[in-house]
């Protein structure tokens, strides 16, 4: 039995498989918040479809490149203080800062790495 697949069909199949994972929308909340040193801060991120644990959190300060804090939803990047933690899987994720420090005042972003454009 000939099991060869025409190249065109294989190409279409690969496009379909890739397309099934694209166009994932990420919604972060709150969009802004007021907090004081010592506060416990929680930021949430929701994906429009399941992304398993393919979720990263970044911190960015003005004029600086984003800094990776958390990868794979809950793994702390080397050198990042333990007051930062991440949790969640599927569609709902949380970044928590257990006790806000002066150097933590920044912008925080979530990023899914389940699919790429």
Swiss-Prot record:
Region described as Framework-3: spans on this chain: 79-110
SMART domains tied to this protein: IG, IGv
GO terms for biological process, alphabetical: adaptive immune response; immune response
Keyword Cell membrane attached: yes
Domain Ig-like: 24-117
Disulfide topology: 45-110
Keyword Ribosomal protein assigned: no
Complementarity-determining-2: annotated segments: 72-78
Annotated function: V region of the variable domain of immunoglobulin light chains that participates in the antigen recognition. Immunoglobulins, also known as antibodies, are membrane-bound or secreted glycoproteins produced by B lymphocytes. In the recognition phase of humoral immunity, the membrane-bound immunoglobulins serve as receptors which, upon binding of a specific antigen, trigger the clonal expansion and differentiation of B lymphocytes into immunoglobulins-secreting plasma cells.
SUPFAM superfamilies: Immunoglobulin (SSF48726)
Source taxonomy: Eukaryota, Metazoa, Chordata, Craniata, Vertebrata
Protein name: Immunoglobulin kappa variable 1-39
Subcellular location per the Swiss-Prot or TrEMBL entry: Secreted; Cell membrane
Annotated source species: Homo sapiens
Region (Complementarity-determining-3): 111-117
GO cellular component, one term: extracellular exosome
Signal peptide coordinates: 1-22
Region: Complementarity-determining-1, residue numbers: 46-56
Record region (Framework-2): 57-71
Keyword tags: Adaptive immunity, Cell membrane, Disulfide bond, Immunity, Immunoglobulin, Immunoglobulin domain, Membrane, Secreted, Signal
MF terms (GO), sorted A to Z: antigen binding
Assembly, per entry: Immunoglobulins are composed of two identical heavy chains and two identical light chains; disulfide-linked.
Transmembrane annotation, as ranges: none
Domain of life: Eukaryota
Region span, Framework-1: 23-45
């Amino acid at each position: 039995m000939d099991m060869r697949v025409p190249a065109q069909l294989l190409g279409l199949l690969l496009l379909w498989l890739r397309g099934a994972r694209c166009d994932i929308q990420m919604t972060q909340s709150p969009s802004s918040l007021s907090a004081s040193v010592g506060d416990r801060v929680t930021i949430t991120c929701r994906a429009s479809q399941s992304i398993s644990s393919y979720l990263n959190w970044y911190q960015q300060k003005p004029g600086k490149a984003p800094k990776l804090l958390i990868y794979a939803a809950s793994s702390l990047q080397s050198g990042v203080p333990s007051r930062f933690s991440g949790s969640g899987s599927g569609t709902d994720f949380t970044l928590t800062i257990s006790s806000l420090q002066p150097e933590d005042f920044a912008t925080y972003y979530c990023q899914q790495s389940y699919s790429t454009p």
